[in-house]
C-alpha cells in the first residue's frame, strides 16, 4: 500500500471529452430545443457550478429555451447518441490524455482511484479501451453516491477507506474543486489552455483554495514532486 492516494475525476482529466460528452450536449439540445449551444456557453454553465451532470445540464438548457421535455426523455436521447449501437456512439471520439509512461511512474509512488460523475460502467468501458492494465481502486461513479458533486460524498467514501493516508483530488471543474474543499482534500485543478474560459476556470480554482493549477494531467508530477 502506497503512502498516498491520488483520486482523479475522469472527463477533462483522464480523457478529452470535447467530441464526446460536450458534443452530445450540443446535439441533444439541438434535437429538443432547435437551438445550437456553443462550447463556450457550455463552459459558462459548468463554471456556475451545479452542472456536473451532463444529463441535468442538457435538460436545463432545453427547458431554458421553452421546450417542455421530461428529464428521462432527455437522458434516453443523450445516451443513445453517446453509446450509439456500441461502435458508432460519440463515446468513440474520446481521447486518452496521459502520455506514455505517466501512469507507470505515478503507480510506482501512489495508489490511484477515480471519483467521477459518469456511471461507473461507462468509466470502466473507457478505461478498458485506453488503459486496460491500469488499476484504479476504488472507482466511484454517479450511482455510488446519493448526492452528486459538488457534494463530497464520493471523496469522503474514499478517504474513509484510505486509513488516514494523504489524498489529492485532480479535477477540471468548479464542482470538483468544491467537492474537494468540502471533503478537506487538497485539490489540483486542470485548466486547459484549449478551454474557451481558461482564465476564469483557473480563477475559480484559486478561489476554492486549489493546491495547484496545471494545464493538463501530464504536468501532475511537477506538483507532486
Where are these regions (language model features)?
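N-terminal helical cap/lid subdomain that shapes the substrate entry/recognition surface
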Residues: 3-10, 14-100, 108
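Short amphipathic alpha-helix with an adjacent loop that forms part of the alpha/beta core around
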Residues: 219-225
Amino acid at each position: 500500500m502506497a503512502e498516498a492516494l491520488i483520486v482523479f475525476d475522469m472527463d477533462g482529466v483522464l480523457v478529452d471529452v470535447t467530441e464526446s460528452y460536450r458534443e452530445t450536449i450540443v446535439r441533444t439540445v439541438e434535437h429538443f430545443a432547435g437551438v445550437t449551444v456553443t462550447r463556450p456557453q457550455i463552459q459558462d454553465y459548468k463554471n456556475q457550478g451545479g452542472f456536473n451532470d451532463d444529463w441535468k445540464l442538457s435538460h436545463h438548457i432545453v427547458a431554458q429555451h421553452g421546450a417542455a421535455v421530461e428529464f428521462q426523455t432527455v437522458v434516453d436521447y443523450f445516451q443513445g447518441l453517446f453509446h450509439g449501437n456500441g461502435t458508432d456512439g460519440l463515446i468513440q471520439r474520446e481521447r486518452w490524455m496521459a502520455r506514455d509512461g505517466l501512469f507507470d511512474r505515478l503507480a510506482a509512488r501512489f495508489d490511484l482511484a477515480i471519483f467521477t460523475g459518469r456511471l461507473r460502467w461507462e468509466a470502466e468501458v473507457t478505461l478498458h479501451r485506453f488503459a486496460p492494465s491500469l488499476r484504479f481502486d476504488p472507482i466511484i461513479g454517479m450511482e455510488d453516491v446519493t448526492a452528486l458533486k459538488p457534494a463530497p460524498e464520493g471523496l469522503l467514501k474514499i478517504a474513509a477507506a484510505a486509513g488516514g493516508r494523504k489524498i489529492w483530488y485532480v479535477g477540471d471543474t468548479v464542482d470538483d474543486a468544491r467537492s474537494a474543499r468540502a471533503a478537506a482534500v487538497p485539490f489540483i485543478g486542470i485548466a486547459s489552455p484549449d478551454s474557451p474560459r481558461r482564465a476564469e476556470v483557473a480563477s475559480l480554482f484559486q478561489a476554492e483554495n486549489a493546491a495547484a493549477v496545471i494545464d493538463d494531467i501530464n504536468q501532475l508530477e511537477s506538483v507532486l514532486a
